[in-house]
Amino acid sequence: MTKQIMPITLSYEPAAACWGEKALISSSEQGVMVHLVGKGKLGAVQRAGRKIDGQGIRHVALVGEGWDLEKSWAFWQGFRAPKGNRSIEWPQLPAAEKQELESRIKIIDWVRDTINMSAEELGPEQLAKRAIDLMCGMACESVSYRIIKGEDLREQGYTGIHTVGRGSSRDPILLALDYNPTGNPQAPVFACLVGKGVTFDTGGYSLKQSSFMDSMKSDMGGAATLTGALALAISRGLKQRVKLFLCIADNMVSGNAFKLGDVIHYRNGKSVEVMNTDAEGRLVLADGLIDASKEKAKLIIDAATLTGAAKTAVGNDYHSVLSFDDKLADDLLTAAASENELFWRLPLAEFHRSQLPSNFADLNNVAASPHTAGASTAAAFLSHFVEEYQKGWIHIDCSATYRKSAVEHWSAGATGYGVRSIANLLLAKAK
């Protein structure tokens, strides 16, 4: 059976009146036309891609004038979906733009595919392997790594990852990946990336309701996003040494799972009382941040699907940014704007660091009433594990990583959002 390919063209004129006053697309024997009138043209192209896919059209060609890199990418973002096969015949682009488009497709599609995998398919070991495979596919000669898993984590002092992950039949893992293109094993580490990789989150004994648990295969979105960001930065020419720490575990209920009231003792001397096992992401990230701080890198970025509070604040369209470093926060917002991604800064102040009191440890893993700024106190908790937290450290609460249902510009599932912005920031800081 011959594959039917639908031509897609762009127009800057409104559709004919018969299509409706606000019609985004119209069709004829020549194919489908996308009508770009008013502001927000990239968003309109992405919505058109989603609408065309919704009509069951799976094979298209972007033809005619106006299809530059960003419009082509916007169309793919909307057109792509987790089920079924799709193909696009791309427009002719300059060589550099073609290479960038191919890199985005390879890497950000990897991020989306990885996050969309079921928890049965993607456990801690599988996530670590996928990250290694992607990075080796980008620059294998410059990549080395070590994996610490299971009881070795406890013996080597990675108490947060071990505590959260010990309740699962699948061993928790720390993946420490070193991208060093300099050829010098003594080269300084320019940046450290620390990602939350909870491959399924039941909430532990602070058990989630089904309506909150059903998307928790995506709770490793921070780890996937940072892996993709490093890969994209490499494809764009990053030549500085970067270390990636993925803190990977299942948060399950079992006779061996951690419990409310347990106290975790970390390598940096901090002790943490667990008063909510569903605030587990910060417990695993703490181990990665301790390692990152030891590297004395000038830039530390952590990313995690950390709090519902951030999503309540900014919705599903923005990632949240929290940092004590105003310049660094501004730099990330600038990077995001240049990559056509939406980030929003949430407050983080010194007083948030004291809103985690415990009667039995240095810190509580959740803030006590009346301290209700959940995203801010979660970031404040993390700051206790960053040596120089006031400068060079930024926390991204990944509110836009995953959608439980389709909207007008995204299919259901992972978005790959944030990969471009973080890659942009890495390159800007590496200059």
Swiss-Prot record:
Enzyme type, top EC level: hydrolase
Binding annotation for Mn(2+) 2: 196, 201, 219, 280
Keyword NADP applies: no
Domain of life: Bacteria
Keywords, ordered alphabetically: Aminopeptidase, Cytoplasm, Hydrolase, Manganese, Metal-binding, Protease
Any single GO CC term annotated in Swiss-Prot or TrEMBL for this entry: cytoplasm
Function: Probably plays an important role in intracellular peptide degradation.
Name of the featured protein: Peptidase B
UniProt source species: Photorhabdus laumondii subsp. laumondii (strain DSM 15139 / CIP 105565 / TT01) (Photorhabdus luminescens subsp. laumondii)
Phylogenetic lineage: Bacteria, Pseudomonadati, Pseudomonadota, Gammaproteobacteria, Enterobacterales
Gene: pepB
